Amino acid sequence: MFKNFKLNKLLFFAPLITLMFCFNAPQNDEEKMQTIMISVKNTLSYLHYSPKPINDAYSADVYDKYMEMIDPGKRFFLQSEVDEFSKHRTKLDDYLNRGDLTFYKLTVDKLYDRTAEIEKYSQEILSKPINFEENDELILEPKLKKYPQNQEELKNEWKKFIKYNILQEIETLNAKEETQREKKDSVNRLKLKDTIKLEILTPAQKQVKATEEVKDLMTSMFKRFQKRKKMDWFSVYMNAYTEVFDPHTNYFSPQDKEDFDVNFVGKVIGIGATIQESKGKIKIGTLVVGAPAWKSKQISEGDEILKVQSKKGEEPINVTGMLVDEAVRFIRGEKGTEVVLTLKKKDGTIKEVKMIREEVAIEDTFARSIIINGANGKKYGFINLPSFNADFEDAKGRNASDDIKAELIKLKAQNVEGIILDLRNNGGGSLTEVVDIMGLFMNNGPVVQVKDGNGRVQVMRNKQNDPIWTGPLVIMQNELSASASEILAG
């Protein structure tokens, strides 16, 4: 639950507390970062439910957390570099107070330089035959590892890591082959028509295929890194500060906040198509029925997006090689505005498709139900609720309580004997929604108490006197059910 922030009347979502900041247009990235650091410090110090001292002890914890986040596998930095970084171990509190980027720039600049070196190492390693007969030891658990002492140890670490990934790919090929054999055996045993074609590879062929797969994997990994902006790493740095202060407090960049809002509200202004990246190409995934891309009848799954004209009159942007998130931001826009995609179809033809952006619902956000026919001949209603979603900006927008109510009415009309409410993997959402949902199952009464940082207690009550369902009810949870899910389950 939101138990660590004073400003939490609306949102009740355990893992995420949003720190948002606005910037004047003239500021460059470095000035933005400095402003953010000071704003984060002030937010933590003055608005947090239970603020802690920002001192040397806090600084040391932030340092440890950040090092785990920036190089989790201890495969990028040398021990000598970490020794240099550690000189700043008790200074991070001071840097936060005054918006000093010294430590951040030191670590991120070194990370970029080192990644370029490792890319060359990887290409060199993969260009030569790899000996799989020699005995090697690769430690995967970071807590049991030490940083490489020198470049030779670093190179050897990556050689073993690459070899490990090739062996994993070979094991995957073996597993697929075994699955094919089992299916073919079943078909023959049942005397069915055999349409299964076995692809049997020799050990040498598997090694070649696995090596090529890992080459593609490494190439893709380094390309993704090159496309990441330093502001992305700054978000990592800021989250080290916030998560040490409290594990349920997070910093969101404007882009992260936009993505969070889209997933929480369950709607987006766009064309209604999932966008995917494959080997540097941006492609169309599934289409939402009724959305602009589907209605155009000119867009198909697998089409490659070459360019996006985000605004009328502007030059189209070449999106080939972009990160998916970056390409998506050109496709999204304001409702009622035009977007033009230049597509390469599967047959090689190039086509321009003009569409007007619309509001598109993300159905995976909302409650859904099915009827389960029991072995005893009775029917049971099963409702899955992914999150306690709500649209705080649109009073007519969809919310979890209205969706659950509609599903209950539908299931009740089917004369189900009981309801199973699935809250597995539901991390929470709107506190108001959980109170309203409680009213669908019970008469009015207190549901939850909220205590702010000044000790004031607010009792939130269910005011409904006409529950929709009073029959048998089972609520399913798992370790990822949190916050509002825990309140509803009682």
Model-derived regions, located:
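Bacterial Sec-dependent signal peptides at the C-terminal "C-region" and cleavage site
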Residues: 5-9, 18-31
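Cleft-lining beta-strand/loop regions that shape enzyme active-site pockets
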Residues: 23-28, 45-55, 223-230, 246-268, ...
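N-terminal mature-domain "stem" immediately C-terminal to a signal peptide or N-terminal signal-anchor/transmembrane
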Residues: 28-71
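Extracytoplasmic/secreted proteins, especially bacterial periplasmic and envelope-associated proteins
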Residues: 35, 39, 57, 61, ...
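Acidic/histidine-rich, surface-exposed loop or edge segments in extracytoplasmic proteins
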Residues: 37-49, 67, 87-91, 216-220, ...
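PDZ/PDZ-like domain segments forming the peptide/carboxylate-binding groove
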Residues: 52, 68-69, 90, 104, ...
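Extended, small/polar residue-biased N-terminal targeting/export presequences
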Residues: 54-60, 67-142, 222-277, 338-340, ...
